Regions:
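N-terminal interaction modules that seed assembly of large macromolecular complexes
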Residues: 41-55
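A generic structural signal for well-ordered alpha-helical segments
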Residues: 29, 95, 124-126
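Short, well-structured alpha-helical interface segments that form or flank functional binding sites
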Residues: 16, 20, 51, 82-86
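Active-site beta-strand-loop-beta-strand hairpin of nuclease catalytic cores
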Residues: 52-68
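Domain-level recognition of nuclease-like catalytic cores that cleave nucleotide substrates
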Residues: 101-147
Length: 147
């Protein structure tokens, strides 16, 4: 078996774990009467504009899904946290007409006594636009709104 130090335990691949999580969020949205399309492209930018593909969206909602967890040693996954920061910037640059939803897999850490999302909010609050809704999947299909 290959040594994959950054491979999450218990899943065939990190990419597959992300896709599985996206499918759970899509199922949740559809069950709540929200129809979205995958890979919704929207022009974003500061001076110039370029298309950016959000995980899901429609004419009024943009959705990003992140399925990262704490590292095996209990530390924050810094490279993945950068991806979350990038998602916040993309939401910030997206047209104001969209409601922005950020879904993350719940990952609790005993050392910090908080979820990875709570850690992100505590440490990177200044990067989070006030216009987004931060949510995590907690067990089954229950979604908790943190902001």
């Amino acid at each position: 078996m290959e040594n994959k130090p950054y491979q999450r335990k218990g899943v065939s691949s990190n990419t597959q774990a992300g896709k599985d999580f996206e499918n759970k969020i899509l199922f949740f949205l559809e069950n709540n009467g929200i129809t979205v399309e995958p890979q919704t492209k929207v022009e974003i930018g500061i001076n110039a504009k370029k298309e950016h593909a959000f995980d899901f969206g429609n004419n009024s909602i943009l959705v990003e899904c992140k399925s990262q967890t704490w590292t095996e040693t209990g530390n924050a996954p810094s490279a993945k946290i950068k991806n979350w920061s990038d998602a916040m910037f993309s939401f910030y640059l997206a047209p104001k007409k969209y409601k922005k939803l950020f879904f993350v897999e719940m990952s609790f850490n005993q050392k910090y006594c908080k979820t990875l999302l709570e850690y992100f909010i505590d440490h990177y609050f200044y990067l989070i636009p006030s216009i987004i809704s931060l949510r995590f999947r907690h067990g089954g299909e229950k979604i908790t709104n943190l902001c």
